[in-house]
Swiss-Prot record:
InterPro entries: GalP_UDPtransf1, GalP_UDPtransf1_His-AS, GalP_Utransf_C, GalP_Utransf_N, HIT-like_sf
Pathway(s) served: Carbohydrate metabolism; galactose metabolism
Classification via NCBIfam families: galT_1 (TIGR00209)
Protein's name in the database: Galactose-1-phosphate uridylyltransferase
Keywords (A to Z) from UniProt: Carbohydrate metabolism, Galactose metabolism, Iron, Metal-binding, Nucleotidyltransferase, Transferase, Zinc
Gene responsible for this protein: gal7
Binding site for Fe cation: 214, 313, 330, 332
PROSITE patterns, per database record: GAL_P_UDP_TRANSF_I
Function (record text): Essential for growth on galactose but not for cellulase induction.
Species assigned in the record: Hypocrea jecorina (Trichoderma reesei)
A biological process term (GO) from this entry: galactose catabolic process via UDP-galactose, Leloir pathway
Swiss-Prot/TrEMBL catalytic activity: alpha-D-galactose 1-phosphate + UDP-alpha-D-glucose = alpha-D-glucose 1-phosphate + UDP-alpha-D-galactose
């Protein structure tokens, strides 16, 4: 840290990705906890569940039947948050009347996908090897490539992709969209409605708030300094090492300086990668290795099925050449657990009304996660 005194005093830290601040209160880690505790997650699941709408061969809510897939499978969400077919909503926003100023709305079209990680109902990414995770990353890449606007400079890169042939082809959209958000909610504590290992990909005609804020900040930084914000940040973290959890030749996992969640991590490529389609075959495998390392260490930390929300931020599907070039691929992991398998962090009170706050410092979290290397804890129990 810049000054060891920050280990003991309350202070604020700046997040250059979102142009925001958070309060850090390391002295509060000693306070007793008498609040809510989460129930321990169920850990015994069958390899196949005849009632699960994600297992191979089963029927889904809308009546469609899943194929007997062997690796990954993607389909349009039966309960999509956005739709491809709906009336256009056009409103004149140029008027200065109060309704136009204060009651603004914007129509959003899109399509939401569900993508399974494995045909097995009882595994998570932490249980899978990097080679087992790789087909999911390949499928993410196909899905992203299929949705790129023809005018996007990345379309030419996507056309040269050589991905392994898959029995389950990635869906193709009916329209061009602005952004694709790939994310996973793992565990009931994060609102996951089905324990079968899966993620989602939502494509929208508008730019969502979080990646939009990051793209604005990355553009400003590059304009001011002539370099990429995250490239400079990686250089700094690799030199200092105190927040580096793990790394391989292509990726580094850090507990970011500005982390809000207790054991939040950021997965970053060591070279400028704009989007999934920029990754080489070896880099996709090394990304799978990074994801496996993060999720295994999470589970080992409190010896539980560690809940989290994770997501990929990358270049838009449709954007100017400059906007695409400003983008820097990265993956966020936001886990809620704080002290044990049953005590989680709540974003309430001061954090809702004022600004984000954390107790354990990212440097302390890094030390804890580094120590969670090794075999997955539950494999030692069997």
């Amino acid at each position: 840290m810049p000054d060891k005194i920050l280990d003991d005093i309350s202070h604020r830290r700046y997040n250059p990705l979102t142009d925001s601040w958070l309060l850090v209160s390391p002295h509060r880690t000693k306070r007793p906890w008498q609040g809510q505790q989460e129930g321990a997650a169920v850990t015994t699941l069958p390899e196949y569940d005849p009632k699960c709408y994600l297992c191979p061969g089963n029927s889904r809510a809308a009546g469609d039947q899943n194929p007997n897939y062997e690796q990954t499978f993607a389909f349009v969400n039966d309960y999509s948050a956005v739709k491809e077919q709906q009336p256009d909503y056009e409103v004149d926003q140029s008027s200065d009347d109060l309704e136009s100023l204060l009651l603004r709305a914007q129509g959003v079209k899109g399509v939401c996908y569900v993508l399974t990680f494995s045909p097995k109902h009882n595994v998570t990414l932490a249980d899978m090897s990097a080679k087992d995770i790789l087909p999911t990353i390949n499928h993410w890449t196909r899905l992203y490539a299929n949705h790129l606007s023809p005018s996007n400079p990345l379309s030419a890169v996507a056309a040269q992709l050589q991905l392994p042939i898959s029995k389950e082809e990635a869906p193709v959209p009916k329209d061009n969209y602005r952004y694709m958000q790939i994310f996973e909610n793992k565990g009931a504590a994060m609102g996951c409605s089905n324990p079968h290992p899966h993620c989602q990909a939502w494509t929208t005609s508008t730019m969502p708030e979080e990646p939009g804020k990051e793209l604005v900040q990355m553009a400003k930084y590059r304009q001011q300094h002539g370099r990429h914000l995250l490239a400079d940040y990686i250089k700094l973290e690799l030199a200092k090492e105190e927040r580096v959890v793990w790394q391989n030749d292509s990726f580094v996992v850090v507990c970011p300086w500005w982390a809000i969640w207790p054991f939040e991590v950021l997965v970053l490529p060591k070279r400028h990668v704009r989007a999934l389609v920029d990754l080489t075959a070896d880099e996709r495998l090394q990304l799978a290795e990074a994801i496996q390392e993060v999720t295994r260490r999470y589970d080992n930390l409190f010896e539980c099925h560690f809940p989290y929300s994770s997501g990929i931020h990358q270049a838009p599907l449709d954007g100017t050449p400059e906007e695409i070039e400003n983008a820097y691929f990265h993956m966020h992991f936001y886990p809620p657990l704080l002290r044990s398998a049953t005590v989680k962090k709540f974003l309430v009170g001061f954090e809702l009304m004022a600004e984000a706050q954390r107790d354990i410092t990212p440097e302390q979290a890094t030390i804890r996660l580094r120590a969670c290397d090794g075999e997955l804890y539950r494999n030692k129990l069997s």
